[in-house]
Curated annotation (Swiss-Prot):
Gene Ontology biological process terms from the UniProt entry: glycine betaine biosynthetic process from choline; negative regulation of DNA-templated transcription
Keyword Lyase: no
Top-level lineage group: Bacteria
DNA-binding region: 31-50
HTH tetR-type domain boundaries: 8-68
Pathway(s) per entry: Amine and polyamine biosynthesis; betaine biosynthesis via choline pathway [regulation]
Organism: Brucella suis (strain ATCC 23445 / NCTC 10510)
PROSITE patterns (UniProt xref): HTH_TETR_1, HTH_TETR_2
Gene designation: betI
Annotated Pfam families: TetR_C_6, TetR_N
Protein name stated in the entry: HTH-type transcriptional regulator BetI
Function summary: Repressor involved in the biosynthesis of the osmoprotectant glycine betaine. It represses transcription of the choline transporter BetT and the genes of BetAB involved in the synthesis of glycine betaine.
GO terms, molecular function: DNA-binding transcription factor activity; transcription cis-regulatory region binding
InterPro entries xref list: BetI_C (IPR039538), DNA-bd_HTH_TetR-type_CS (IPR023772), Homeodomain-like_sf (IPR009057), HTH-type_TetR-like_transc_reg (IPR050109), HTH_TetR (IPR001647), Tet_transcr_reg_TetR-rel_C_sf (IPR036271), Tscrpt_rep_BetI (IPR017757)
Entry annotated with the keyword Transcription: yes
Length: 198
């Protein structure tokens, strides 16, 4: 029987173990037993907390999105200008918590399996919409709404593409280079546009 008060800790350990296990294998073809072993708990306890693999996988993805949203909100609160807001959005998407090798591999796996899972597809769409709307909010203070939408679409595609590129490579993810690439793209797209920022 699990100890009282241990559930949040055990759930987090299992979610972290799921990220590592999925990332190491590059597939959702993992078992609750494998995830539980990685977490150092029994499969029965994992089933007790999550009720099965599908719910554990969804909880893992929700956790990643929650962390991303929390970090993004904190970073945006520190931004005083549209340019600072854009920089904060890009930096958070390539933060150490998100742009780590196993987490990148887990994200790529989620994208692949979105073709078979409506729940995963829905969560990825939520992520994409939030990224897009956050970028547009800042960009439309610097250019037209139509152009802001196009730039945000391109920046989102670059972020996803950099995750895919790093997931397929053996090198340690280089967040600084990734951030610079996306920032350069946005700067080039905005060049020559009348700025609303003083």
């Amino acid at each position: 029987m699990p100890k009282i008060g241990m559930e949040p800790l055990r759930r987090r350990e299992l979610i972290d173990a799921a990220i590592r296990t999925i990332g190491q294998r590059g597939s959702l073809d993992v078992t609750v037993a494998q995830i539980a072993h990685e977490a150092g708990v029994s499969p029965a306890l994992a089933h007790h907390y999550f009720g099965g693999k599908d719910k554990l996988i969804l909880a893992t993805m929700r956790h990643l999105l929650r962390e991303l949203g929390r970090d993004l909100n904190a970073a945006i609160k520190q931004a005083n200008t549209p340019h600072e807001r854009i920089a904060a959005i890009i930096a958070v998407n390539f933060s150490a918590a998100q742009f780590a090798q196993e987490t990148i591999a887990a994200w790529l796996t989620f994208y692949v399996h979105a073709q078979q899972s409506d729940d995963i597809k829905r969560l990825l769409r939520i992520y994409a919409r939030r990224l897009h709307s956050n970028l547009v909010f800042a960009l439309e203070q610097l250019t037209s709404r139509a152009r802001a939408n196009r730039i945000a679409e391109g920046a989102g595609a670059m972020i996803d593409g950099l995750y895919i590129r790093h997931a397929l490579g053996a090198d340690v993810p280089d967040a600084a280079s990734a951030i610079a690439l996306v920032e350069d793209y946005i700067a080039i797209q905005l060049s020559g546009q009348p700025s609303a920022e003083n």
